[in-house]
Structure formats: structure tokens, C-alpha cells
Amino acid sequence: MKNVVVVGSQWGDEGKGKIVDWLSDQADVVIRFQGGHNAGHTLVIDGTTYKLRLLPSGIVRKNKISIIGNGVVVDPWALLEEIEEIKSKGVEVNVDNFIISESANLILPFHREMDEIREDAAGKGKIGTTRRGIGPAYEDKVGRRSIRVMDLRSETNLDHRLETVLLHHNAIRKGLGKKIFEKDKLKEELLKIAPEILKFSQPVWLRIDEFKKQKKRILFEGAQGILLDVDHGTYPFVTSSNTVASAAATGTGCGPNSIHYVLGITKAYTTRVGEGPFPTELTDDIGELLGSRGKEFGTVTSRKRRCGWFDGVLVRQTIKISGIDGIALTKLDVLDELDEIKMCVEYELDGKKMDYLPAAVEDQLKIKPIYKTFPGWKSSTQGIKNIENLPENAKNYIYALEDFIGTKVSSISTSPEREDTILLENPFEV
């Protein structure tokens, strides 16, 4: 029995959906452990497209148990809407195949509004959030004033918790000249949907312990990417949760010894959505080509992604931070038309060479990438399923990438289709 954690090794949008879908087919249990509905997966199964934001990818598979862990912040209205959306496509979501941690924190309307207010006020200094209330909800969690799923069970307790959290938020809203939130109205709205949320609520840590004893395969599904981690990412241009593999333990209530393999999803080039440092960003025709061929638009926001060359220095760093055992290299086929391909192998900062990304954002913004150039292969890799059938220059690029980052490539994706994958190592069977 092996348990696998999937994380993004860059800034998110690495193509986790396809890989997670393939792994979830082999897993018994699939668990989301951090983030909210600010990041999404697009799955295509038997010609049907599913866009998931909160629900784990296992939900579209029969005989799988899908779980939202305590580390996730949940917008209850968005969750119910997503459930109805996939139900309309024939997917079953019931108390037998879906569980929400009773300790998960809720995103409420004033969180969304606060997110928007801050982003609008920040001007050029904005973070580039999805304006869905994720950050403010995590702030309330850390501030010990949050409302959790379990609080929906008691009207008296909910009233008290709302009073506490609104004391904080309404004080800020008054200072900003905004209308205050009415406690009774919000309580009424929450009590109205409470039964639909509570029927899925369980102590997730206890269920995971049972699954481990039953030798079930567990897939921990990360959202976003390591470079957006609140501690280890390009702070302050990060998300509000820990996106590294170790967050799977804290975000679900299982010990770190429950993790046996960490798979880092890694794009063959680099993208970033929103603001923040991006050493290898391309603003020329090549950047546009990568964006066009890679269809680089966000699943949740439809925002255009910034594109650039593969940054080996960054990926090598995230591999060390997250304890990645192997990478799934995605979107190799996007590079098919290029005459030459570059890989960042070092940085220069104020005339000095560096082999890692410094922590200070001021330094990150000044960094100059140093590249190694590889000849392109100028032929299609799309649909190839055996590494020996790849063009020689494509293989050379992969081997050089693997050697530089110091971690094996466990699979290579050669198109958005699930079947178009070169499998070199199955994380569940290592």
C-alpha cells in the first residue's frame, strides 16, 4: 500500500488535472488538503469535460471516496453549486463517496468583499488574487475567529461565532466607509444551507486512519504550486496556504509517515498567472507562441498566463523544499515548433552568480537568468507513448532537465489527452 502526494513544482497550472485523474483511477481515496476554489482542474473523461475547483478529482470516478480536508477553506455556496454542476453531467455525489472535514473553515461573503476591496485599493501593488475570499478566510482561521463546518450544527453556537467574526470585519468595513454586515441575515443564509453541508461532515482524521488500516491507496491532491506557498514561495505574491507536500499531513490530520511518494507536476516551460517575480518570463513572440500552443488561460478565472523558459534553478529548489521523489513532465508537445529551447541553469544578481532564488522579493525582481540552449526537434511529439519514439533532441532535453534538477522524470505528457502519456514509473508501485 502506497500513498501519493501530488504537488505543483512551479507557480501552479502545471497540468495537474490530467495526472491526478490518471492517479485517482488507481486510488481508493482522493483528498484535497489546502487552498479553496481559487485553483481548478480540468478533466476530460469519455468526451465529457469537468471543471473542478473544490471537489477532489476522484469524484468523477466510480467507487472512489473523495474528501475535503481541514486545510481547505470552503465557500459553501460555491461547493453546492459545483456539486449540482457535476451532478447534471451524471456524476454521483452522496454521503457514501464524499466527505468534508468538520474542521474545515468557511469562506463567507465578507471574505470575498474584503478580497476585492484590498485588490482594488492596492493598485500597482496588488497581489493578483482571484478575489474569491481565500486570503481573508485564512486570516480569520489563524486569528481564531473563523466559522467552521461544525459550527453550522448549532444555531446558538453559530450566532456566537458570527458575532465574534463580524466584530472584527465590521470594524474594518466602517473604517473603509463600507456597509456593515447584518449578523441575523447572514445566520439565516447559513442555516438555510447547513443541512446540505453537514450531511457530508465527518472527522476526516479518523476516517483516514481507518482507510490506512484497510490498506487503501490514498491520493493527496494539492492545488496551485510550491512557488505560491505562503512560506516558501515568492512572498508576498503567494497564496495564503502551504502548498508543499508536507501540508498534506497537517491539512488532513494524518502523520507525515502516511506519505510514501511525492510527485511534482512540472511543465516543460514555465508559466505564472497574476503578479510577482518571474525570472524567465518571455514577452516576445516566443512567449506568445507558448501561450497560444499551450492554451495558457486559467481554469477558474480565464486569466491569461505569463509564459517563459523552463527555470531549472527554481524547480531544483522546489524539489528540495517539498521532498519530491519524481516529476511528471507536462506539455512537452508545446515546444515542438521551436528552433531552439532554453533552460535557466543559474542566476545573476548584482554581478554575482547564484544557484537558488533569494527570499527577498526585491532581489527576485532584479535577477537575470543564465541559460543553456538546446536545439529544438521541429517535429510532433503529440500522442507519443514510448520515450524511445521521441525525437532525439527531445530526449536530450529531457535527460538534461532530469540531470540538472537531480530528480527522475516519472512520466511525460505529450498532449492533453489522458492516454498520451509516457509512463516511466508508477508512484503507487514504487
Curated annotation (Swiss-Prot):
GO terms for cellular component: cytoplasm. InterPro entries: Adenylosuccin_syn_GTP-bd, Adenylosuccin_syn_Lys_AS, Adenylosuccinate_synth_dom1, Adenylosuccinate_synth_dom2, Adenylosuccinate_synth_dom3, Adenylosuccinate_synthetase, P-loop_NTPase. One of its GO terms (molecular function) is adenylosuccinate synthase activity. It comes from the Bacteria. PROSITE patterns: ADENYLOSUCCIN_SYN_1, ADENYLOSUCCIN_SYN_2. Mg(2+) binds at D13, G40. Its cofactor is Mg(2+). IMP binds at D13, E14, G15, K16, N38, A39, G40, H41, T130, R144, Q224, T239, R303. Its EC number is 6.3.4.4. Plays an important role in the de novo pathway of purine nucleotide biosynthesis. Catalyzes the first committed step in the biosynthesis of AMP from IMP. Homodimer. This is Adenylosuccinate synthetase. The gene is purA.
